[in-house]
Amino acid sequence: MQRVLELLLLSSTALAVIGDGFIALPVHKLQAGEGSAHFPNRLPIFDVVNGVAKSVEDDVNQIIQPIFGNGIFSGGSIQGTHSGNGHSVKYEVSLPSSSSQKGSNGPSSTDNKDTDPSKTGFSLDDLMNSIPTDFWNLIGLNKAPTSSDNGSKDADFTPSAVSQVEQPTSKSVESTAPGPASSASSSSSSEAASSSQPSEDSQPSSSANKKTGAFFLSLDNTQTLYTATLKVGSPAQEVQVMIDTGSSDLWFISSGNSQCKVNGGSIDCDKYGVFDKSKSSTWHDNKTDYSISYYDGDKASGTMGQDNITFADGFSIENANFAVIDNTTSSIGVFGVGYPELEAVKSKYTNLPFAMKEQNLIAKVAYSLYLDSRDAVQGYILFGGIDHAKYTGDLKAFDIVQSNDKYVYSQIPLTSVASSLNNYTNAYGLPAGSNHPKVGAVIYNGTDSFNGGVDLKDTPTLLDTGTTYSYLSKDQVESIVGLYGNVTYNDAGKAYEVPCWVGNPGNYLEFNFKNEQYIKVPTSEFVISVGTYASGAELCVFGILPGTHSILGDNFMRSVYAVFDLEDHVISIAQAAYNDNHAVVPIE
């Protein structure tokens, strides 16, 4: 049997918005190995830093892999569409210019609501008056607000950063009403943004001067993991990392990593970049050892310290805690955005999601995820905000399930899974008359009668962008695969075989959360072609794998819009809407 699995190497642009600004970040795809068994599975095994091995059942439930970015989106206008009162208004506003400010740098960031024209080249009033009247009417104002208005926050705008709405784009806004609570209300609020290009020489500013808002980083959809670039240290060094909702530590590969080819090892560390702490004037080594092991066999060990992390010019975290890895078999670092309980050191520290609030980049330790469709070039993670244009129906909030009375994993109850098969084209290999799966187990031909489905009994399930595939218990996976015929385990692929036609367009799985939210995922996300049988027929395996922990990875997450609130301990989900629109509202 010959197994073949090819993944394309793609590149795209990542976005960032902090406070009132938007920044574009370049990102690049990773190339995976062959077969489902070789996809990264970076579930931490235990904490080896302090010699204490926590039980796998207590200290696991995630796999690592997603990402971050860096770069700048330059723009000279505000562009967008605002919906309200049953209709929408498209707007594009060129920023006023002045002889006092020439060149491409645009207006500088400021915390002053009244912008100084001598410094920025235009005033706030100039900017507000440039926006069409229809926009202000939509949000309930008769005219543009001015710097002398001291009333409501219906339009508290500050021309302090970059914004845009065309793909790939992002925007930051201030809501006309209090931002959505952790329950992630689906009602939209008014929005606006300003446009500029940050200076190339921007340095991290103090937290007192930072504007609280929402920012997002666009992520490349590789179907294996997501990568982007961070700027680390002073002067900044660009290093690519993976972003993961299921882990909590940030670590970079050191230039001195013994496994790098340049140091006599076998790993091409230049591919994604390394961090040379000796070249950073702001690096501080706190003399704490760091070590972690993953289920895919990778290990990482090094030293914890602090330095400045820049998501885009002018938008940074000062003295961010992270590890510099001197010995690892991985070719790329990790950016975890989970609970501090998952940190691989005994003395817990303020990881980046919490540092973002601490340094006033966001008002709440919360972020939302939109990975877009399987074939999309990019998705994004939005820190401190919700993009109401990216889902359909209502966001439903679910309490995060604790582990041993602690908030450790970003997991919610999964009640059941059912299948809808509407396309039997090229169905083969089953006895005559048996192409249709078992009665009582699936939805037939698009009808809404489940007649059962697979009961998962509210299994606590991790929502993890760091996992390529998904995992359920062996019995649960076999029950789902059994919907499509005989259950056969493929030892080489470490997965269950499934008829390839199951992945035809129009077929889907429906995931039921507490009988309150139902997420439809195309079966094509779970049907993986890995080669051929001896007969020459195509061989496919199922992308929900047997495991000791329940995880919904990238092949599920592409179909859901998810808001992770690590303060109120809830995750809100809705069916993802694939479009180019944005309606960003900060979470307050």
UniProtKB/Swiss-Prot annotation:
Similarity comment: Belongs to the peptidase A1 family.
Result after altering residue 467 to A: Abolishes pepstatin A insensitivity
Propeptide: 17-143
Impact reported for residue 242 to A: Abolishes pepstatin A insensitivity
Region (Disordered) residue spans: 83-126, 145-209
Coiled-coil blocks: none
Location within or outside the cell: Secreted
Species annotation: Candida albicans (strain SC5314 / ATCC MYA-2876)
GO molecular function, one term: aspartic-type endopeptidase activity
Recorded effect of pH on activity: Optimum pH is 6.0-7.0, the pH of the saliva, for cleavage of both casein-resorufin and Hst 5.
Post-translational events: N-glycosylated.
Biased composition (Polar residues): 160-175
E.C. number(s) listed in UniProt: 3.4.23.24
Keyword line: Aspartyl protease, Cleavage on pair of basic residues, Disulfide bond, Glycoprotein, Hydrolase, Protease, Secreted, Signal, Virulence, Zymogen
Carbohydrate attachment residues: 150, 286, 308, 327, 423, 445, 486
Subunit architecture: Monomer.
Pfam families: Asp
The name this protein goes by in its record: Secreted aspartic protease 7
